[in-house]
Amino acid sequence: MRQIIIAGNWKMNASKEATNTLVIGILSGMADVKSKVIVCVPSLYMSQVEVLVVDSQLNLGAQNLNVNKLGAFTGEISADMIKDFGAKYVIVGHSERRSLYGETDEIVAQKVQVALDNNLTPLFCIGELLEDRESNNTKSVVSKQIQVVIDRVGIEAFKNIIVAYEPVWAIGTNVTATPQQAQDTHAFIRSMLAEYDADIAQITSILYGGSMNSRNAAELLNCKDIDGGLIGGASLKAQDFLQICKAG
């Protein structure tokens, strides 16, 4: 039985004060949450959140990492730096990193490998553009993104990878894939993994990352192959986020 995982991606939001308020607000409602909950916060606030979540069931994650251990990479953050703040998770290959910063499937696969090599669990993001879906290319796009990672790290590595399917056309748009559309793609992802190893496919968590919110979370999480959510905007309000966390 796969545990529901809810991961909040704050993106480039919050302030020092807002971070404190938001984390305390989330912690105050965690007593009856059965899901695994992760908050992926801006790197500047990781030390602040590390202190707030100590000895709690709230897990800390980062939003990106550089493939290099250290060096002249201005503005970047390494796996060692992430671990220094007690984080165990890192988002890799988010659609915004792919589209705005030119991260290719190969770069994403390299980041997945670096995360794994450093005992960080990657939240490996995949997904298609609107034109891909309209031209019936969702499966080919998603399968290529997965294949490049399998070729680099092997199917066994998926024991320690969380997959996040994010239909790019449904991110930050208030347009959500129907539960059936989401389930169909999640089922396809699992079937692709099963072609390599059926047991690993069954234990791999596949999160939905397309504008899940407190209104649609329960229906989405009720789908057979949807194991949680990668939450953007709704993770910035404690009560909305908690409602999603409790929906599973």
From Swiss-Prot:
Q: Which EC class, in a word?
A: isomerase
GO molecular function annotations of the record: triose-phosphate isomerase activity
Instruction: Tell me the pathway.
Output: Carbohydrate biosynthesis; gluconeogenesis; Carbohydrate degradation; glycolysis; D-glyceraldehyde 3-phosphate from glycerone phosphate: step 1/1
The subcellular localization recorded is:
Cytoplasm
SUPFAM superfamilies attached here? Triosephosphate isomerase (TIM)
Which residues does the Swiss-Prot or TrEMBL record annotate as the active site? H94 (electrophile), E166 (proton acceptor)
Native source organism of the sequence: Ruthia magnifica subsp. Calyptogena magnifica
Under Gene3D superfamilies, the record lists: Aldolase class I
Q: Among its keywords, does the record have tRNA processing? A: no
Family (UniProt)? Belongs to the triosephosphate isomerase family.
Q: Which GO terms describe its biological process?
A: gluconeogenesis; glyceraldehyde-3-phosphate biosynthetic process; glycerol catabolic process; glycolytic process
Alphabetically sorted, this entry's keywords are: Cytoplasm, Gluconeogenesis, Glycolysis, Isomerase
> Any stretches that span the bilayer, and where are they?
none
Provide GO CC annotations from the record.
cytosol
Q: Which Pfam families match?
A: TIM
Entry binding sites for substrate: N9, W10, K11, G172, S211, G232, G233
Protein name (Swiss-Prot/TrEMBL): Triosephosphate isomerase
> Subunit comment for this entry?
Homodimer.
Per the record's keyword annotation, is Cytoplasm included, yes or no? yes
Matching entries from HAMAP family are given as: TIM_B (MF_00147_B)
Q: Which reaction does it catalyse?
A: D-glyceraldehyde 3-phosphate = dihydroxyacetone phosphate
Entry's EC annotation = 5.3.1.1
The protein's role, per its UniProt record: Involved in the gluconeogenesis. Catalyzes stereospecifically the conversion of dihydroxyacetone phosphate (DHAP) to D-glyceraldehyde-3-phosphate (G3P).
